[in-house]
Amino acid sequence: MKSSPHLVLILCLQAALVMGVFAALAKENAMVESKAIDINPGQLKCCTNCNFSFSGLYTCDDVKKDCDPVCKKCVVAVHASYSGNNKFRCTDTFLGMCGPKC
């Protein structure tokens, strides 16, 4: 069987296109994985509503007057429109076991 130079060129271009698609997908997946979870290395003093997973990560759903000092992302959980006494929740993800109950 005689191979045509055009056929060889088309096969090479197709192979390059497929490799480019796989390279783009690998780059996109690497970017997603690097943004996955920001883990706080600290330990909460206490947590009553602990969400522990078998991966060793946990979050605390306690709503308190103030967030724990180790908390990096403290958000308002309950707005107190008239009294001015907002309640806060720490939205950090921690590594380890849940601390004692508050």
Swiss-Prot record:
The site (Reactive bond) lies at 52-53
What's in the keyword line of the UniProt record?
Answer: Disulfide bond, Protease inhibitor, Serine protease inhibitor, Signal
Q: Supply the induction statement.
A: By wounding.
For molecular function, the Gene Ontology terms on record are: serine-type endopeptidase inhibitor activity
Q: Which organism is it from?
A: Zea mays (Maize)
Signal peptide position in this chain?
Answer: 1-15
Pfam families given for it? Bowman-Birk_leg
CDD domains given in the database record: BBI
Q: Which family does it belong to?
A: Belongs to the Bowman-Birk serine protease inhibitor family.
The family database entries (InterPro entries) matched by this protein are listed as:
Bowman-Birk_prot_inh, Prot_inh_BBI, WIP1
| SUPFAM superfamilies found in the cross-reference section | Bowman-Birk inhibitor, BBI
Gene of this entry: WIP1
Q: What is this protein called?
A: Bowman-Birk type wound-induced proteinase inhibitor WIP1
Q: Which PROSITE patterns does this one have?
A: BOWMAN_BIRK (PS00281)
Query: Does the entry annotate any disulfide bonds, and if so which pairs?
Result: 46-102, 47-60, 50-98, 67-74, 71-90
Give the transmembrane region(s).
none
Entry's Gene Ontology cellular component terms: extracellular region
